[in-house]
Regions:
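Acidic/histidine-rich catalytic cores of soluble enzymes
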Residues: 1-55, 107-111
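Acidic (Asp/Glu)-rich catalytic clusters
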Residues: 7-16, 63-73
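Conserved, mostly hydrophobic/aromatic
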Residues: 19, 54, 68, 77, ...
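Short Gly/Pro-enriched loop/turn and capping motifs at secondary-structure junctions
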Residues: 24-26, 59, 84
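Glycine-rich S-adenosyl-L-methionine
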Residues: 56-63
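A short, acidic, flexible beta-alpha connecting loop/helix-capping segment that sits on the rim
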Residues: 78-88
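Short, flexible loop/turn segments with low-complexity composition
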Residues: 80, 107-117
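C-terminal helical cap(s) of enzyme catalytic domains, especially alpha/beta-barrels
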Residues: 88-109
Length: 117
């Protein structure tokens, strides 16, 4: 919907208690159905957007995790899996593995601190 999700994290940092991970892919060109998809089922090539397994869509999860680390978020990352083109068990497992891979610990020291010594 055009929301800057990284800025949203920074702006509402004190209101975030659970993070819901879900990926989506959207078309780079005009298609038969607009942004809201209307009457078309998920998985229909004429849709403007569709859900994807984590890491297979357009969402920049690296920037999301960095923003969450910046606000010192330590709560859960939950995965909601949806991808009409993939087997459910394989896709959900792949998404779970991806979520574990992208969830890196923030640095315990300031990178630039060594330059001030």
């Amino acid at each position: 919907q055009g929301v800057d999700y990284v800025n949203f994290i920074r702006k509402f940092h004190d209101k975030i208690f659970n993070v819901h991970l879900k990926d989506v892919a959207w078309s780079e060109k005009l298609v038969d159905a607009g942004v809201f998809g209307g009457y078309l089922n998920f998985g229909d090539y004429r849709r403007f957007w569709d859900f994807r397994s984590l890491g297979r869509g357009n969402i920049n999860f690296d920037n999301i995790i960095r923003a969450l680390n910046d606000i010192r978020y330590t709560g859960p990352l939950s995965v909601e899996w949806e991808d009409s083109a993939m087997d459910r068990v394989a896709g959900a497992s792949e998404s779970q593995d991806y979520a574990r891979k992208i969830d890196f610990e923030p640095s315990a020291i300031a990178f630039d601190s060594s330059f001030s010594e």
